[in-house]
Amino acid sequence: MSTTLLQSDLPGLPLRHRGKVRDVFDIPRDRLPADAPPGDYLLMVATDRLSAFDVVLPDPIPGKGEMLCQVSNFWFHKTEHLMPNHLVDIRVEQVLPEGVDPALYAKRAVVTRKLKPVPVEAIARGYLIGSGWKDYQRTGKISGIELPDGLRQAEKLPEPIFTPSTKAAVGDHDENIDFDAMVKTVGAELAERVRDATLRIYRFAADFAAECGILLADTKFEFGTDADGRLYVMDEMLTPDSSRYWPADQYELGTSPPSYDKQFVRDYLETLDWGKTAPGPSLPADVIDRTRAKYAEALQRLAGISVD
């Protein structure tokens, strides 16, 4: 059984950012292996924290961080022929402070390049669901993209589409924007590179997932650039937290299909008299267990990795 980690504190590694799920640390040069290439590096730790409706909940999902990290690493390696990523060939145990148990971080942490984030969320959609479905019902468009009339909830789109959104701070909500707004934010050349990479990776991943009996409805990527302007995909990749995966045998047009994510949590929270603001309520044990099982099933079906 995995050890649960709600928050990581690593003396000697400056905390750069504590997000909803991940803790990110700067790695001082003297903690790197002597043969590490020049440049700045980060240690990214996937904790077992769980967020819903942009609020971090008090109860962790045991082993969730390890499962997310393993799914991400699987996809980073699977897609490196399509797009370079932030991973580097430095082992986690090489940079951990003395006295820290390497086993606690072995499956939930990675050493990465330190990149300049592109300040836009890159979203690919292959099916009409979620906020895209709501936008379509209201306007017939998603992020300014005209779609055919008469599409139904969860319907497969004629072609995958790129629908960027703002990158909100913790506790705030992302907002869908059109491509022109993205161009104004990051410039035309970078916007086109991000759009092309997003759709290229999505198509590849959707085809692979289909072979595993899973539909990849949509997914969100984050990108960053190095000092030379090279583009990398970063943060997490095609995890149940950043993607909407549906069991193909349970897909039904006109409904919101079950997914490999925290839907059990959202459904439970919707039954409560809670204003969807911090602090979040505690979760019953059965909701935690069922959510963990969904993450574990996604890891096994996609990457062939079983957990205890």
Curated annotation (Swiss-Prot):
InterPro entries: SAICAR_synt/ADE2_N, SAICAR_synth, SAICAR_synthetase_CS
Biochemical pathway: Purine metabolism; IMP biosynthesis via de novo pathway; 5-amino-1-(5-phospho-D-ribosyl)imidazole-4-carboxamide from 5-amino-1-(5-phospho-D-ribosyl)imidazole-4-carboxylate: step 1/2
Catalysed reaction, written as an equation: 5-amino-1-(5-phospho-D-ribosyl)imidazole-4-carboxylate + L-aspartate + ATP = (2S)-2-[5-amino-1-(5-phospho-beta-D-ribosyl)imidazole-4-carboxamido]succinate + ADP + phosphate + 2 H(+)
Source organism of the structure: Xanthomonas oryzae pv. oryzae (strain PXO99A)
GO cellular component, one term: cytoplasm
Family according to the record: Belongs to the SAICAR synthetase family.
Cross-referenced SUPFAM superfamilies: SAICAR synthase-like
UniProt keyword terms in alphabetical order: ATP-binding, Ligase, Nucleotide-binding, Purine biosynthesis
Protein name (database record): Phosphoribosylaminoimidazole-succinocarboxamide synthase
One annotated GO biological process: 'de novo' IMP biosynthetic process
Pfam families xrefs: SAICAR_synt (PF01259)
Domain of life: Bacteria
